[in-house]
Design a protein with these regions (language model features):
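C-terminal capping/extension of enzyme domains
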Residues: 2-21, 31, 38-106, 129-130, ...
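Short, surface-exposed acidic-centric catalytic microdomains
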Residues: 120-205
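Glycine-rich His-Gly loop
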Residues: 112-117, 284
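Internal catalytic-core helix/loop-beta-alpha segment
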Residues: 182-243
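Intrinsically disordered, low-complexity regions enriched in glycine and serine
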Residues: 23-27
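Short, hydrophobic/glycine-enriched beta-strand segments
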Residues: 104-114
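Internal, well-ordered interaction modules that form the hydrophobic cores of assembly/scaffold domains
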Residues: 114, 127-130, 137-143, 219-233
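Short, conserved, surface-exposed binding loops centered on an aromatic residue
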Residues: 102-103, 176-180, 218
């Protein structure tokens, strides 16, 4: 009598039939390669039939996954910000060949920007932004006018109503530099090169300072350094010239802004008896510094920069 046990072993004939059906079903599957006209060779068929396709597909999938990851990473990575570089220092000695002057004015005041803005670099002009107050104030204090002061629509900037000189006193940029330096003033920047997206001092990264200490060693008549752009510039000056402060050669200016910015860095000897140069934190000339009006900024610069500087120039000429 035949056994009714469901766990009984399959007969060889039934097993062979099952294998044949499975093979037929597999043969009926049309792969994408076959639909595109690719007919696998016997070797390829044998390779796939043994299950090696699983590891092959896995490796391929992992490879493409890594490539996709690389593409995604490179496409989302922020573009590198190019380094920008400051101008060379400008003083009367650097202008003499252009002007034909026979005598060189000694430098008594070195005015430092932080680093040229996009507008300055594109125009190759220090303090080149049209609404930067620097050249407007220099003109008011030294007897010239920067330009007409009109915007793209032909309307005058607000600050032009406070200017001391009319259109007949407008000078070109080169002539402004010539007059400015002939009075013993010099221009440079704190930062020689840096990475910065935009023009804000706060966005400066990986900076390298200019050789300002060496400049002053070469110009022993320098009596004051003026930081033209406020707080961030002062912070960078302190960071890069801490040893200069510790040497005792520098002292804070007499205004409140300078004392606040520099007192803790200065070497306090007997009333700064060894100090040769005062460092002034000035009201910022930047158009972004809107806390003070143009008139307030000009008054500060006249009291602490141009007034004392012109007196020093007269004294130096008498030597």
């Amino acid at each position: 009598m035949a056994s009714s046990n469901p766990l009984r072993r399959s007969s060889p004939r039934r097993k062979a039939t099952s294998v044949a059906v499975t093979a037929a079903a597999a043969a009926a599957i049309v792969t994408p390669q076959q639909s595109a006209g690719f007919v696998p060779s016997p070797v390829t068929s044998r390779y796939f039939s043994k299950g090696a396709n699983t590891s092959k597909a896995s490796r391929s999938s992992r490879l493409f996954s890594e490539r996709d990851k690389e593409v995604t990473t490179s496409s989302t990575k922020k573009p590198k910000v190019e380094r920008t570089h400051s101008f060379q220092p400008v003083w009367h000695g650097s202008m003499v060949k252009k002007s034909g002057d026979s005598e060189v004015a000694d430098v008594h005041t070195l005015v430092l920007g932080t680093h040229p803005s996009i507008a300055s670099l594109s125009k190759s002009e220090m303090f080149g932004h049209t609404q930067n107050a620097f050249w407007w104030m220099a003109g008011d204090c030294l007897g010239f006018r920067r330009q007409l002061g009109l915007n793209a629509e032909g309307k005058p900037y607000k600050l032009t109503q406070y200017l001391r000189y009319d259109e007949s006193h407008v000078l070109s940029y080169e002539d402004q530099l010539q007059l400015f330096t002939s009075k013993g003033f010099a221009l440079w920047d704190i930062i020689k090169s840096c990475e910065r997206k935009g023009s804000l001092d706060a966005d400066i990264k990986n900076e390298e300072p200019n050789e300002i200490w060496d400049f002053c060693k070469s110009h022993k008549t320098v009596k004051r350094i003026v930081l033209a752009n406020g707080g961030t510039g002062c912070t960078m000056f302190n960071r890069h010239f801490r040893d200069w402060w510790l040497s005792g050669e520098l002292k804070p200016g007499s205004n409140a802004e300078s004392k606040k910015a520099f007192d803790k860095f200065a070497k306090k000897t007997d009333n700064f008896r060894d100090a040769k140069i005062e460092v002034i934190s000035a009201l910022s000339v930047s158009p972004a510094a809107a806390k003070y009006s143009y008139e307030e900024k000009r008054q500060f610069w006249e009291d602490y920069v141009y007034g004392p500087g012109l007196k020093d120039h007269e004294e130096l000429q008498k030597r």
